[in-house]
Amino acid sequence: MQADFVIIGSGSAGSALAYRLSEDGKNSVLVIEAGGSDFGPFIQMPAALAWPMSMKRYNWGYLSEPEPNLNNRRITAPRGKVIGGSSSINGMVYVRGHAEDFNRWEELGASGWAYADVLPYFKRMEHSHGGEEGWRGTDGPLHVQRGGFTNPLFRAFIEAGKQAGFETTEDYNGSKQEGFGLMEQTIFAGRRWSAANAYLKPALKRDNVGIVYGLARRIVIENGRATGVEIERGGRTEVVKANREVIVSASSFNSPKLLMLSGIGPAKHLKEMGIEVKADRPGVGANLQDHMEFYFQQVSTKPVSLYSWLPWFWQGVAGAQWLLSKGGLGASNQFEACAFLRSAPGLKQPDIQYHFLPVAISYDGKAAAKSHGFQVHVGYNLSKSRGSVTLRSPDPKADPVLRFNYMSHPEDWEKFRHCVRLTREIFGQKAFDAYRGPEIQPGEGVQSDEQIDSFLREHLESAYHPCGTCKMGAKDDPMAVVDPQTRVIGVDGLRVADSSIFPHVTYGNLNGPSIMTGEKAADHILGKQPLARSNQEPWINPRAAVSDR
């Protein structure tokens, strides 16, 4: 087998690459995917989002090493093992990122990736339903919508934010990227609108695009150039030849793993694994970043939450309604209200994110209390803690070693304590008076710094937004893995394009910027002139210097 471009991974970025690289019909594209089909309601029905993440069929099922600052717990670290990658098992929340996120990328050496540069790519990829005119794309492959917003708890959350003195925003992906508002979803016509549905499946209808299901074992490098990919499928090993380039889009865990298996990475570590060093790049696997969050849960005194739908019978009713009409509760991820807030005066951008959910529940679908309730997923999203991805062994089937070093920076503790106290302030507003019952979690007895820290050590979890392990930067940056054209430094014919190249984590969910990365990388690969820079300036809170709201 051979193709002009061989893409490893059909996730958020890989699917976008397959679509754009094959668009003019001049180049052949072959996608290598270790997973399989996304057929069936577990992935396609939005309300079933807890299911695919818990199924080994769709999830690599990684765990971190014991985290010393979190009571040595091993933290769940899912990644999609299916067409569409993690966009097929995620929560379907769509966040571009704040303008300051991308300006920071450029400051860190990713020239040409400032907000003015990436905004046109976000517009190109979007088909926005209800977004801010002039700021959003309307004819791209990726459908983005808002939910039905019928539950009164959603309205109470946004009203409580206003009562607490915070801003509201009509579109946090538009000009005003701060405040309380409606959450956007990658859902269309009642179905999860994954990168597979938006990009990969349309691309596979073209004669010049193919897909092979198998495990990428290593990149073949000859005389300093990537010439193909060794894959395993059906118990046999074979090489897929790349006539032009190999593009790695295998996730922030598996992209650095594959580079290291191929001899690209920290020379000392590769030698310890018995792997021949092809390019000594110490940044491969370094700079691992993520978002953490906890659930703040409250009893609802009125029976308006989704608790009534949790029994198996009623879940079956919702599922049947969705199967028949693609409507009803099954057609939403139920994340329909949110907030992006600044933790302190002097910050240009929000650093706290809220997802509001009108039920008190864990991510695996188990009820947190035998009553109606509501919750927020809340986290400090600009942590300075950094971790790493390394090899466990030279066996391509071995899981990578994930050391996040969560909560290793003192500021993280300060910010998460603030999250607990700020959430109590928001839930204590008049808008929640009609619904507010006892606090389920953390619990009203958790008040002091020491009590909050103890709660956090036991209850903080990943928000599943890993990035940064093949950092993009200037060629003279010894820790950069790819240059701003996404080319691997030191190896010809090889690129990386996915969330692993982010120099710094963005302030929200990563599916949107990952797809944007695939879109922009495709233009670099094809040698196209980048889309014209935008001159639009986003809103900055005029009180930012003196107030957190």
From Swiss-Prot:
Catalytic site positions:
465
Sites where the protein binds FAD: 4-33
Reaction(s) catalysed by this chain, per the record, are: choline + A = betaine aldehyde + AH2; betaine aldehyde + NAD(+) + H2O = glycine betaine + NADH + 2 H(+)
Q: In which pathway does it act?
A: Amine and polyamine biosynthesis; betaine biosynthesis via choline pathway; betaine aldehyde from choline (cytochrome c reductase route): step 1/1
Q: Name one GO molecular function term.
A: flavin adenine dinucleotide binding
Q: Which organism is it from?
A: Rhizobium etli (strain ATCC 51251 / DSM 11541 / JCM 21823 / NBRC 15573 / CFN 42)
According to its UniProt entry, the protein's GO biological process terms are:
glycine betaine biosynthetic process from choline
**Which family does the UniProt entry place this protein in?**
Belongs to the GMC oxidoreductase family.
Q: Which InterPro entries does the entry mention?
A: BetA, FAD/NAD-bd_sf, GMC_OxRdtase, GMC_OxRdtase_N, GMC_OxRtase_C
Query: What are the GO cellular component annotations?
Result: membrane
NCBIfam families registered for this protein in UniProt: betA (TIGR01810), PRK02106.1 (NF002550)
Its EC top class is oxidoreductase
| The protein's required cofactors | FAD
Read off the Pfam families from this record: GMC_oxred_C, GMC_oxred_N
Cited function? Involved in the biosynthesis of the osmoprotectant glycine betaine. Catalyzes the oxidation of choline to betaine aldehyde and betaine aldehyde to glycine betaine at the same rate.
This protein's name: Oxygen-dependent choline dehydrogenase
Q: Does the keyword Oxidoreductase apply?
A: yes
E.C. number: 1.1.99.1, 1.2.1.8
Query: Which stretches does the entry tag as region Disordered?
Result: 530-549
Key words, A-Z: FAD, Flavoprotein, NAD, Oxidoreductase
